A protein has these predicted regions:
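C-terminal motif of bacterial Sec signal peptides marking the signal peptidase cleavage site
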Residues: 2-3
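Asp-box/BNR beta-propeller blade signature and adjacent active/binding-site loops
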Residues: 6-368
Length: 368
């Protein structure tokens, strides 16, 4: 792999900053391009502190000029004094009832901390809301836990699923082939009592072939401690998940591949080129007519959440031919979005105090 160490000299804008507005902390970026071209940047607003549990809302800022300027912050999910988080947005382009496209935002709610959830003391649920006007307004929430997360309140409660988290980051819709139109949300859950090294966690996913009317569940990734996951449809139609390993044993990203839209898994492996601390990362297929580029974003370190780095593959992740360090300091969660035919947006946690949006041009980086 050929490294390019200097930070990219590209436009950057701070969308959320700790201690400003109504929240002490902002985390968990997710970003989406709406059907008419607007960019939607989602985040968690954490009222008291930066902890995962507490009074947490889901926030949105919109840009109608490709990310040059942004709307004021909008609260789109408020679960009272409890937690709403793990935003996973996706556009449904293929529903004939919504020819202009409809946006889904999947999210989780919880009534106790993750530690207590692992002990079976609370309930995590999965919901979605939708927008028919490119993110300006949103529907009432729909709780789909009965179908996609088998906690104690569901008819499959004997499976004893406890924690749950969508992605976080963008979800996906298949755009071609036998599974065209399938909405797929990578996720993870725990099951049963806590195990050493978080080994009760498994990555999985859930999906719909009828625009959210009914839901199916992918089998678990059979790797103990597999955790937060994000996915993409590869040029050959396969589904790829890129997954966090919660116990941190390998310090590498786990990859899972499916040839049937996530109904089964044909291969899992740890990617030796994708080093990582215990943290979330993102992937995106940057689609072009002649050649699609698989892009990865995440902290490029085995020890600390630091060195936000982009990595590029021209063969669906078999080889990573280029990397570009975007920020050498503190860096954690991120998400990627294709802005137009030439540019990609990176929305990431910078220095543990800001959520920053940065534009880059893959061809320019690959030609350096």
């Amino acid at each position: 792999m050929f490294a390019c160490q200097s930070p990219a000299e590209l436009p950057e804008i701070v969308l959320f900053e700790n201690g400003t507005g109504d929240y002490s902390c902002y985390r968990i970026p997710a970003i989406l391009k709406a059907p008419e071209g607007s960019l939607l940047a989602f985040a968690e607003g954490r009222t008291e502190n930066c902890g995962d549990f507490g009074n947490v809302d889901i926030l949105l800022r919109r840009s109608e000029d490709g990310g040059k300027s942004w709307s004021n912050t909008q609260v789109i999910v408020d679960f009272g004094t409890l937690q709403a988080g793990n935003p996973a947005p996706v556009v449904d382009y293929f529903d004939p009832e919504y020819p202009q496209g409809r946006i889904f935002l999947f999210y989780n709610t919880g009534n106790v901390s993750e530690n207590d959830m692992r002990l079976g003391k609370g309930i995590r649920d999965v919901h979605y809301i939708t927008s028919e006007d490119h993110g300006k307004t949103w529907s009432a929430p729909v709780n789909i836990s009965e179908h996609v997360h088998f906690n104690a309140t569901t008819s499959k409660g004997h499976l004893d699923w406890r924690t749950h988290a969508n992605t976080p980051g963008h979800a996906l819709q298949f755009k071609k082939g036998s599974y065209k139109g399938r909405i797929y949300i990578p996720a993870n859950h725990s099951a049963g009592d806590p195990q050493e090294g978080f080994n009760e966690y498994r990555a999985y996913g859930f999906y719909s072939d009828d625009h959210g009317k009914t839901w199916s569940v992918s089998p678990d990734i059979d790797i103990p401690s597999s955790n937060e996951a994000i996915g993409t449809e590869l040029p050959n139609g396969d589904l790829m998940l890129n997954i966090r390993e919660q116990n941190g044993k390998t310090k590498r990203r786990l990859v899972a591949l499916s040839s049937d839209g996530g109904a089964t898994w044909k291969e899992t492996y740890f990617d030796s080129a994708l080093i990582t601390p215990v943290c979330q990362s993102s992937i995106l297929l940057f689609e072009q007519k002649k050649q699609s580029i698989l892009i990865y974003s995440g902290p490029n370190s085995t020890d600390k959440r630091e060195k936000m780095t982009l990595k590029f593959s021209l063969d669906s992740g078999k080889n990573w031919v280029k990397e570009k360090e975007i920020h050498p300091g503190g860096a954690a969660y991120s998400d990627l979005v294709q802005v137009n035919k030439e540019q990609v947006g990176l929305f990431y946690e910078k220095d543990f105090k800001q959520l920053v949006y940065k534009v880059f041009t893959p061809k320019a980086i690959l030609s350096e």
